[in-house]
Amino acid sequence: MIVITCLDQKNGMMFNHRRQSQDSVLREHVAKLVANVPLWMNHYSASQFDTESIPNLNIDDAFLQEATRGEYCFVEDAPLAPFEKWIERIVIFRWDCTYPADRYFDLQLGSGQWHLVGTSKFAGHSHDLITMEVY
């Protein structure tokens, strides 16, 4: 599976059971990135996407168990460490700031297993700068 997630500058994901932020331009980038490949997510994340922009959107609260090789998973509030051996690639959309957080990204990107292979930057709708990192 290919993981897509949004993190702040300190790898924060959520605060008080809510996403830290969201951005409409980022969602457009996700739609272009996945193209016609299935994109899996849970019901919580699905509330910000629509099937018109992502025709192969699959919504299941057990999405990390359902996704197969080459399919994308948009992860906002789930631990990834139990699924790390099945993750082929990680795409992080990094906010240009730090938000309060009580849930953090639980994979160690500096452990030697993951290598940064590309970055790109773009202006979001509600963020001056969003950086896409691919591992």
Predicted segments, located by residue:
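Enzymes that bind and transform nitrogen-containing heteroaromatic metabolites
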Residues: 1-135
